[in-house]
Amino acid sequence: SGSCEVKTCWWSQPDFRVIGDFLKDKYDSASEMVVEKHRESRGWVETLRPKYTFFKPPTERDLVYYESSPNFCEPNPETGSFGTRDRICNVTSHGIDGCDLLCCGRGHNTRTEKRKEKCHCIF
């Protein structure tokens, strides 16, 4: 009787958290660029150059941008953003629902409510 060996190779994705952390690091260290137009023999050419020359230039693996993100803290009908004013936030959270981040440093008002509701409890 003969023997048979099977060898299987595959690529697997890292955990979603690992990918998210990697992208967040890239986002946090992204380089702002400026679009420069110059004339060459084939016409006008646009190139990107770093806005700030005192930082090291980005590599091919770095994230770059040439337009700033809109300010989502304030209402902007052009982008459809309602802003964050009057939103409910979580005072104890340091995440995206936390008051420090959601209120964009404007501070927040704390409101305590007492409600009287019928609970339809059966004892």
UniProtKB/Swiss-Prot annotation:
Glycosylation sites: N90
Residue intervals passing through the bilayer: none
Gene name, Swiss-Prot/TrEMBL: WNT-3A
Keywords from the named record: Developmental protein, Disulfide bond, Extracellular matrix, Glycoprotein, Lipoprotein, Secreted, Wnt signaling pathway
Alphabetized Pfam families for the sequence: wnt (PF00110)
This protein's GO CC annotations: extracellular space
Disulfide bonds: C89-C104
UniProt-recorded name of the protein: Protein Wnt-3a
UniProt subcellular location: Secreted, Extracellular space, Extracellular matrix; Secreted
Family note: Belongs to the Wnt family.
Function: Ligand for members of the frizzled family of seven transmembrane receptors. Functions in the canonical Wnt signaling pathway that results in activation of transcription factors of the TCF/LEF family. Required for normal embryonic mesoderm development and formation of caudal somites. Required for normal morphogenesis of the developing neural tube.
Main location (coarse class): secreted
Description of post-translational modifications: Disulfide bonds have critical and distinct roles in secretion and activity. Loss of each conserved cysteine results in high molecular weight oxidized Wnt oligomers, which are formed through inter-Wnt disulfide bonding.
